[in-house]
């Protein structure tokens, strides 16, 4: 069972990343990269307080964890579970997507 919750938007981000990787490289590469992102989300879920870097300038309490060429953005919920909000490419203007 996942140790985190994930937003609909983050699921869409994940799908778009997978689709882009299939179109650009291959399904095998897309599956590997998807697994890398899934592992990052598992790591966030295991220790959300100590994982990630603060991005309070975007949203108070927002944290980001670098995985491959993407940042997994999340907040820590009242129940101490991570809530994955977005998964964005490292070169994106993050503020535009929140």
What are these language model-derived features?
Residues 1-36:
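Arg/Lys-rich, positively charged N-terminal/basic patches that mediate binding to nucleic acids
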Residues 18-21, 30-34, 59-62, 67, ...:
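A generic structural signal for ordered secondary structure
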Residues 71-98:
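Enriched for short, Lys/Arg-rich terminal
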């Amino acid at each position: 069972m996942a140790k985190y919750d994930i937003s609909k938007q983050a699921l869409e981000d994940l799908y778009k990343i997978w689709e882009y990787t299939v179109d650009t490289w291959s399904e095998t590469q897309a599956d590997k990269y998807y697994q890398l992102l899934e592992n990052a989300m598992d790591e966030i879920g295991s220790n959300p307080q100590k994982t990630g870097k603060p991005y309070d300038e975007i949203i108070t309490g927002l944290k980001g964890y670098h995985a491959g060429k993407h940042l997994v953005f999340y907040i820590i919920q009242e129940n101490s579970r991570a809530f994955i909000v977005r998964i964005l490419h490292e070169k994106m203007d993050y503020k535009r997507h929140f």
